[in-house]
From Swiss-Prot:
Plant specific protein that enhances G-box-binding factor (GBF) DNA binding activity. May function as a nuclear chaperone or lever and regulate the multimeric state of GBFs. May contribute to bZIP-mediated gene regulation. Is able to refold denatured rhodanese in vitro. Reduces DNA-binding activity of BZIP16, BZIP68 and GBF1 under non-reducing conditions through direct physical interaction. Acts as a negative co-regulator in red and blue light-mediated hypocotyl elongation. One of its GO terms (cellular component) is nucleus. This is GBF-interacting protein 1. Residues 182-191 have a biased composition (Basic and acidic residues). Residues 91-102, 121-136, 550-567 have a biased composition (Polar residues). Expressed in roots, leaves, stems and flowers. GO terms for biological process: positive regulation of DNA binding. Monomer, homodimer, homooligomer. Under non-reducing conditions, predominantly present in high molecular weight forms, but predominates in low molecular weight monomers under reducing conditions. Interacts with BZIP16, BZIP68 and GBF1. Interacts with LBD18. GO terms for molecular function: identical protein binding; unfolded protein binding. Pfam families: GIP1_N. It comes from the Eukaryota.
Length: 567
């Protein structure tokens, strides 16, 4: 059971199970709204009584809900958007625009104005339709000379009629650009464009049209050139009119060079997600400057006479000839082959692809860029402080000394630790002496061959640490003439006995004493003199007693060091 309620001639059937809910909402809101209004808001709120109550409470009570007649007038003039009973712009409610679901097309269009000047009229797919394929935007501009007896309305009805028969989903024309006003608004050259959403795969196969004869005109190539020359004065305003006054302009940085046509026309929100997906999936937009609409196999012909291809132009150079039918192409540009008869010659416009996937407008003049046109590349993203070293460098060398760092990785320290350590010696001293070079041994003079010979000292650049270098006399068996000089040298290796003795070495030699240098005059008792080892006496076997000999090799005993007078 349902209840019929309404005011102002409108009849709305309310289900019986919702009568109690609507009655409760009406009591909460103060009985200021009719059942029809409450039911309309209830459907808009997706059958949520709480949201319906809140929405009705925020509505202004000083204005009555518009009647059905007023809503019909509003739908006939879609220039003015309903703003609710409050008149507030910030209240996002489509309640006043909905006439119980009958004007859903106007509500879903979000206020898009589809008004066409001239003799053309705008048409779109049905509201309750579903379309699985992406429609191609087909626009047929004037001037087109038609035979007598055939009007634009008949042609339009013939094109739209198969679409009305198919269950296709609504594809608003405002999705192609930022506003549908771009698509349908005529240019200054008085070219009216008819925008039709056509899907080739969903049209029935038994429809045939006589539209082919009306559009196949042998003199269209000349008319296209004339229309392009006339439209060139518009400076491609069709791409730049998308809500210029309402939305802020895009400000380009100084280092980015853009075309002059985009400096004042590109605004925020010019391209939505559907537009980018449409351009990226098809890779080109099918327009029809001089559309040759043909009906073959029962399909509503998609006009593909003027195919604007997106090509990758490295030099951004395009040579367009507006006065002739020839087009000069760069080596890296491609143009799809033409369809139709040979008499219909159409000049293909080649546009460079851009990062924003801009679709070519069908009634736009050819775009000509200056020679050697270049776009400055965007600056590469850098760190905030612009680190001049790579990320794997470790700039904490002074705090973490690389004692255990392997050699291949020590270069990553930004400190002296990572560089090769220089020698602390003078440049000439740290180099090894070549073989055979003379080493000046000063104060070396031949002495007596009595006792054990003291070691031969070689002066070097290091300072004395625990001992003093005291040159002493040495006995050297001179066999060469140069060794008899005052300064003598030797090229043989030094043995352990020739090292300068010092308590720092902590050596204990067996069978021979350690030779200490000569005692200094100022420091007594610190060193002891070398005691020579007496040679054993040669005694004949007759007189040699049995037992140990009376004369033995006496080992030197270290004397006590007298340090009392040295400080």
């Amino acid at each position: 059971m349902s209840r019929i309620s309404g005011d102002g001639g409108s009849r709305v059937s309310i289900p019986a199970d919702l009568l109690q809910t609507i009655q409760n909402i009406r009591e909460v809101t103060g009985k200021q709204h009719s059942d029809e209004d409450i039911f309309s808001v209830f459907k808009e709120c997706f059958s949520d009584p709480h949201e319906t109550t809140q929405k009705l409470l925020y509505l202004d009570t000083f204005h009555e809900v518009r009647s059905k007649r007023e809503r019909k007038k509003e739908n006939l003039v879609p220039n003015t958007q309903g703003r609710g009973r409050t008149g507030r712009k910030n209240f996002a409610s489509s309640y006043t625009d909905a006439s119980n679901g009958r004007s859903a097309a106007f509500k879903k269009q979000s206020g898009a104005n589809h008004i066409i000047g001239g003799s053309g009229t705008a048409s779109s797919a049905p509201n309750n339709a579903r379309n699985d394929t992406k429609p191609s935007s087909i626009m047929a501009p004037n001037p087109i000379s038609l035979p007598s007896g055939i009007s634009n309305q008949k042609i339009q009805d013939a094109i739209i009629s198969p679409v009305d028969k198919v269950d296709t989903e609504e594809q608003p024309l405002s999705k192609a650009t930022s506003s549908s006003k771009d698509v349908v608004e005529p240019d200054k050259s008085k070219e009216s464009s008819v925008s039709v959403a056509v899907s080739d795969s969903v049209v029935e196969n038994d429809t045939q049209y006589a539209v082919v004869e009306t559009f196949q005109i042998p003199q269209q190539s000349e008319r296209v050139i004339k229309s392009e020359v006339a439209a060139s004065k518009c400076k491609n305003e069709s791409l730049l009119k998308s809500d210029v006054g309402e939305r802020p302009h895009v400000t380009f940085p100084v280092h980015i060079q853009v075309a002059k046509m985009l400096e004042n026309g590109l605004t925020f929100g010019s391209f939505d997600s559907n537009f980018v997906r449409e351009a990226s999936s098809d890779k080109f937009t099918i327009g029809c400057d001089d559309s040759n609409i043909e009906s073959s196999h029962g399909t509503a012909a998609s006009a593909r006479k003027d195919i604007s291809t997106f090509s990758q132009d490295k030099n951004h150079e395009i040579s367009n000839s507006a006065a002739q039918n020839e087009l000069t192409l760069q080596p890296d540009q491609t143009v799809l082959p033409e369809e139709g008869s040979e008499g219909d010659k159409v000049k293909n416009e080649v546009l460079p692809i851009t990062d924003t996937h801009q679709a070519a407008k069908c009634d736009a003049p050819p775009i000509s860029y200056p020679d050697q046109y270049s776009l400055a590349a965007a600056q590469q993203a850098m760190h905030l402080y612009r680190q001049q070293y790579s990320l794997n460098y470790f700039p904490y060398g002074p705090y973490f000394p690389p004692y255990y760092m392997p050699q291949p990785y020590i270069h990553q320290y930004l400190s002296p630790n990572g560089f090769q350590q220089q020698s602390y010696l003078p440049p000439g001293d740290d180099a090894p002496a070549p073989p055979g070079a003379e080493l000046p041994l000063t104060h070396i003079k031949p002495g007596s061959d009595i006792g054990n010979s003291p070691p031969t000292t070689i002066p070097f650049s290091y300072t004395s640490y625990a001992f003093n270098h005291i040159p002493s006399a040495a006995t050297i068996n001179a066999t060469h003439k140069e060794e008899k000089k005052e300064n003598m040298y030797t090229t043989g290796p030094l043995s352990l006995a020739n090292l300068q003795a010092s308590p720092m070495y902590n050596l204990s030699l067996q069978g021979q004493p350690i030779a200490f240098p000569t005692m200094q005059a100022g420091i007594r008792g610190l060193y002891q003199q070398t005691q020579p080892i007496l040679a054993p006496l040669s005694i004949s076997a007759r007189t040699e007693p049995i037992g140990p000999s009376h004369v033995t090799n006496q080992q030197p005993q270290a004397a006590r060091t007298n340090l009392g007078n040295n400080y």
